[in-house]
Amino acid sequence: MIIFKKKAILKVLLLVPVFWICSLIFFAATSNDSSQIGSNNDLANKIAEANFHPKAAKQDVIQGFGPPIEPEPVVENNKVEEEEQPGGNLAKPKFMVDPNDPIYKKGDAAQAGELGKAVVVDKTKLSTEEKAKYDKGMLNNAFNQYASDMISVHRTLPTNIDAECKTEKYNENLPRTSVIICFHNEAWSVLLRTVHSVLERTPDHLLEEVVLVDDFSDMDHTKRPLEEYMSQFGGKVKILRMEKREGLIRARLRGAAVATGEVLTYLDSHCECMEGWMEPLLDRIKRDPTTVVCPVIDVIDDNTFEYHHSKAYFTSVGGFDWGLQFNWHSIPERDRKNRTRPIDPVRSPTMAGGLFSIDKKYFEKLGTYDPGFDIWGGENLELSFKIWMCGGTLEIVPCSHVGHVFRKRSPYKWRTGVNVLKRNSIRLAEVWLDDYKTYYYERINNQLGDFGDISSRKKLREDLGCKSFKWYLDNIYPELFVPGESVAKGEVRNSAVQPARCLDCMVGRHEKNRPVGTYQCHGQGGNQYWMLSKDGEIRRDESCVDYAGSDVMVFPCHGMKGNQEWRYNHDTGRLQHAVSQKCLGMTKDGAKLEMVACQYDDPYQHWKFKEYNEAKAIEHGAKPPS
């Protein structure tokens, strides 16, 4: 009898913890308020832990950096004074949004930044503490977080969309899309504004989900506060956590892998979508699943967060230069003639890469992104070439507008030792550019280094039956200047001083209307790589050396000669400006360029291109008399 009682007691002791464990598992499975995907810090487990250890759950009210969490219930006489929630201890998180916090206000016309207006912060009038906060926001984000935190995450945007877009009719049976937003330590107000603009301006029947891909953020507001805030959307917003810092390309691929929508729409984490942005994109894909579409990208000022809306007539299309850098240019005349309305979708040779929609199955058929690409850079051109050369179409849709915060620098830190953009670009060139790859290699002084195995990507191109890059240039981007037509190219060296000085653009590739200077020759190409066209232009891809009577500048090439026409004599080394008849020289210390009267024996007017094709110069009549 005693033995029987002992066995019974033992069974009870064993069954009680088993019962509680099963209960916890059941409640965790049925309380899926935060749609966290593959996370190591599941929200349900955190709430359970907080309830078992109440002191651990204490959290201060957060303003501007995360959602305020409702305070702990008051415990008196071991009794919790709160309304009982279904699901026991695993109750859904509650939110106590501070009504005085400007970022959560909705529908207040007097709110800062409404209708996309600028928020101007006079830093000189801030207290020492507020100045420190202002500076920290700038340092962490490379945009004015202080101004952003004064603007509602629900703010309204300009309503001056093109009138024709307001009456445009779209297919009634459009596919559903997953919107994928990758981020790393994005500012709270900016990230939430991006998400809310998607949720509030996309018809619910078209929005499958929003997938937030966290690329291993380490700021507190991107962790539990973000999970708890997004749980209010009932599974519409999901969070995917990367287990290590992977970069934009791999983060996007992970997002695509879990997305369930028929169409994938990619956005950056510092965007705002305008009303009616989604329907025009999905309509084009509905008509042809091999069409990849981009919205018009409006500029959100990185300092004031003013939304600059552009009209359809001024839509630009994407291009690239032989440094394999993306650029914008106006719609070519040949395409403009084929359009009946300014709001008609327009073909684009390339995409900027941050904002676009693509049929998921078609994306997979194209091989998604090159898995050998690291971090970011070059993926937009790879996808653009692949779309056009392998039977698809790439368009910009003027009735779809999304604002984007364009920063002047990147706030992110990466491991050093490898030029990631260069490595990605070499892989791109090897697979897609055919013999034209030499034009890129000349710009990096033919220093290729280790770019990995590309055999699988070449096989992909072969299996897809893609066209040649020459076909792409002839049919999709005939406006691009081809370096093979150059009379001379490479560095432009002057040896009057030592070390020798080279003509140097001294600005970023996309910066124009800036002075040209000289710098010690470095042999790396880049800012010192120039081309002399058959028309006498000294080109840096789409920029030309221009002289209008004051400084020697780089301006966008206009193809009309004039101030951009130069006559080069390789024998004497003179670069003579056709209009002014002056010659390009430099000061005695080699520090500055100057335009002076031509003198045959002046070594400071003696310039040598690294490569010169005399036969081509004679052929095009580009060789002036000595």
UniProtKB/Swiss-Prot annotation:
Disulfide bonding pattern of the chain: C165-C399, C390-C466, C502-C521, C544-C557, C583-C598
Cross-referenced InterPro entries: GalNAc-T, Glyco_trans_2-like, Nucleotide-diphossugar_trans, Ricin_B-like_lectins, Ricin_B_lectin
GO MF annotation terms: carbohydrate binding; metal ion binding; polypeptide N-acetylgalactosaminyltransferase activity
Binding annotation for Mn(2+): D268, H270, H404
Catalytic activity field: L-seryl-[protein] + UDP-N-acetyl-alpha-D-galactosamine = a 3-O-[N-acetyl-alpha-D-galactosaminyl]-L-seryl-[protein] + UDP + H(+); L-threonyl-[protein] + UDP-N-acetyl-alpha-D-galactosamine = a 3-O-[N-acetyl-alpha-D-galactosaminyl]-L-threonyl-[protein] + UDP + H(+)
Role of this protein: Catalyzes the initial reaction in O-linked oligosaccharide biosynthesis, the transfer of an N-acetyl-D-galactosamine residue to a serine or threonine residue on the protein receptor.
Protein name in the entry: Polypeptide N-acetylgalactosaminyltransferase 5
Organism from which the protein derives: Caenorhabditis elegans
